């Protein structure tokens, strides 16, 4: 197995759905199925914060979500927890700046997908040099889902990454909705990552379809 290509990674980032049980008011398994039917291209399991499952319950829930992703041939990524990602043989892991260092993560994960949250050009360059396959850049807009977020960067912050020569695939993170998706792609992102825009939507299926439409309308400006 070899590392994922930039072109394939870019395609997978189009509509990146992140969810845990506490991000939903309806059955999370059904929400994931509806989102997959609607066209999400990659899924991240993020079970943390108030009311999150722990221990065996968390692992069982992750396995259920992973099985659904497999049915649809969509990569299943684990947020922060490298050990869980290895235990589940997940397709990859996403880490933040406060989590396990990228060099150690790459050693453990082999050629699997690794995404890194970055807020500065220095963090981005370090992540790329040490094996990141994609960057999560944000928060682009204000968000209520994550309580420990950094300062809002806006689409200008995202565009700055491209202006400074950051050429690997980027997914925009934070406060992204159907209405502002186009501006995130225009600023240089390959795709958008969302939680509540799908998990709390009246119809996860319809919401996902609209996000897919917005991303494909703009098309990424990067040729890998």
Swiss-Prot record:
It is an enzyme of class 2 (transferase). 2-[(2R,5Z)-2-carboxy-4-methylthiazol-5(2H)-ylidene]ethyl phosphate binds at residues 143-145, 175, 195-196. NCBIfam families: thiE. The lineage of its organism: Bacteria, Bacillati, Bacillota, Bacilli, Bacillales. Condenses 4-methyl-5-(beta-hydroxyethyl)thiazole monophosphate (THZ-P) and 2-methyl-4-amino-5-hydroxymethyl pyrimidine pyrophosphate (HMP-PP) to form thiamine monophosphate (TMP). One of its GO terms (biological process) is thiamine diphosphate biosynthetic process. GO terms for molecular function: magnesium ion binding; thiamine-phosphate diphosphorylase activity. GO terms for cellular component: cytoplasm. This is Thiamine-phosphate synthase. Its cofactor is Mg(2+). Pathway: Cofactor biosynthesis; thiamine diphosphate biosynthesis; thiamine phosphate from 4-amino-2-methyl-5-diphosphomethylpyrimidine and 4-methyl-5-(2-phosphoethyl)-thiazole: step 1/1. It catalyses: 2-[(2R,5Z)-2-carboxy-4-methylthiazol-5(2H)-ylidene]ethyl phosphate + 4-amino-2-methyl-5-(diphosphooxymethyl)pyrimidine + 2 H(+) = thiamine phosphate + CO2 + diphosphate; 2-(2-carboxy-4-methylthiazol-5-yl)ethyl phosphate + 4-amino-2-methyl-5-(diphosphooxymethyl)pyrimidine + 2 H(+) = thiamine phosphate + CO2 + diphosphate; 4-methyl-5-(2-phosphooxyethyl)-thiazole + 4-amino-2-methyl-5-(diphosphooxymethyl)pyrimidine + H(+) = thiamine phosphate + diphosphate. InterPro entries: Aldolase_TIM (IPR013785), ThiamineP_synth_sf (IPR036206), ThiamineP_synth_TenI (IPR022998), TMP_synthase (IPR034291). Keywords: Magnesium, Metal-binding, Thiamine biosynthesis, Transferase. Mg(2+) binds at residues 80, 99. It comes from Bacillus cereus (strain ATCC 10987 / NRS 248). Its EC number is 2.5.1.3. 4-amino-2-methyl-5-(diphosphooxymethyl)pyrimidine binds at residues 44-48, 79, 117, 146. Binds 1 Mg(2+) ion per subunit. The keyword Cell membrane does not apply.
């Amino acid at each position: 197995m070899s590392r994922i290509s930039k072109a394939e990674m870019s395609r997978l980032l189009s509509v990146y759905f992140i969810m845990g049980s506490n991000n939903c008011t309806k059955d999370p398994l059904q929400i994931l199925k509806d989102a997959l039917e609607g066209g999400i291209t990659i899924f991240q399991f993020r079970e943390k914060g108030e009311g999150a499952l722990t221990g065996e319950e968390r692992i069982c829930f992750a396995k259920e979500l992973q099985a659904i992703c497999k049915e649809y041939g969509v990569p299943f990524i684990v947020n922060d927890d490298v050990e869980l990602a290895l235990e589940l043989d997940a397709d990859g892991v996403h880490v933040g700046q406060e989590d396990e260092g990228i060099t150690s993560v790459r050693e453990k994960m082999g050629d699997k997908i690794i995404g890194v949250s970055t807020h500065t050009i220095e963090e981005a360059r370090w992540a790329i040099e040490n094996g990141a396959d994609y960057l999560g850049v944000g928060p682009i807009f204000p968000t209520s889902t994550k309580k420990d977020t950094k300062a809002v960067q806006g689409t200008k912050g995202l565009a700055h990454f491209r202006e400074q020569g950051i050429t690997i695939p980027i997914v925009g993170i934070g406060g992204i909705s159907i209405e502002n998706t186009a501006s995130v792609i225009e600023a240089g992102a390959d795709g958008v990552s969302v939680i509540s825009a799908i998990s709390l939507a009246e119809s996860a299926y319809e919401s996902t379809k609209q996000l897919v439409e917005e991303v494909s309308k703009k098309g990424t400006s990067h040729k890998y």
